[in-house]
Amino acid sequence: MLILDRSSPQIFISNEQQDVSIDLQSAQRLVVLFLELQKVSTDQVYVYFLDDTALAQLHDEQFSDPSPTDTITLPIDKPGIASFPHVLGEAFVSPKAAMRFLEQYTEDQLYHEISRYVVHSLLHMLGYDDQTDEDKRIMQEQEDVSLSFLAEHQALLRPAV
C-alpha cells in the first residue's frame, strides 16, 4: 500500500491482484492530478486494484449481484461537506476486466482503459451518475476530458518497474 505524504490528501493505493502490473506511484499521481483538475479538496481517497473473484464478491455483498464488473465505487463524504477527516470514497477496480473488454490491445491501450476505470470511480465519488443515457453521455464526456488532461501531464497508470 502506498500513502501520499501528510501535506497533501492521503491517497491509499492497494494492488491486490496479479493480472496486470500496476505502478502504485502512477496511480497516486493520477488521483492527485484528477482532484486538482476537478478542484476537489479532500483528506483521503482509497483505490484498490482487485482480481475478478474479489470484485465479484464485493459486488455481491454491496449490490446482491455476484456477476463480474469492472469497477465499484463507494462514495463516503460528498465534496464540500465538512468532516474530518474528509474521505471522498473508495474505488475498487478490476484490471482484468479491461483486458477482457479490449480483447486485443497494446500495453498503452490497456493502461489507458484501467485509468478510465479509476477516473470513472472518482467521478462517481464526485456525484456523477450513469443510470440514464444523458447521465452516461455526461460521464463519458467527463472521463474523456479527465483522461486527456492526465495523459497531457503523463499521469495515466503505468506498469510497475
From Swiss-Prot:
Zn(2+) binds at H120, H124, D130. Its EC number is 3.1.-.-. One of its GO terms (biological process) is rRNA processing. GO terms for cellular component: cytoplasm. Keywords: Cytoplasm, Endonuclease, Hydrolase, Metal-binding, Nuclease, Ribosome biogenesis, rRNA processing, Zinc. One of its GO terms (molecular function) is RNA endonuclease activity. It is found in: Cytoplasm. It is an enzyme of class 3 (hydrolase). Its main location: cytoplasm. Pfam families: YbeY (PF02130). Its cofactor is Zn(2+). Binds 1 zinc ion. Belongs to the endoribonuclease YbeY family. Single strand-specific metallo-endoribonuclease involved in late-stage 70S ribosome quality control and in maturation of the 3' terminus of the 16S rRNA. This is Endoribonuclease YbeY. It comes from Chlamydia trachomatis serovar D (strain ATCC VR-885 / DSM 19411 / UW-3/Cx). The lineage of its organism: Bacteria, Pseudomonadati, Chlamydiota, Chlamydiia, Chlamydiales.
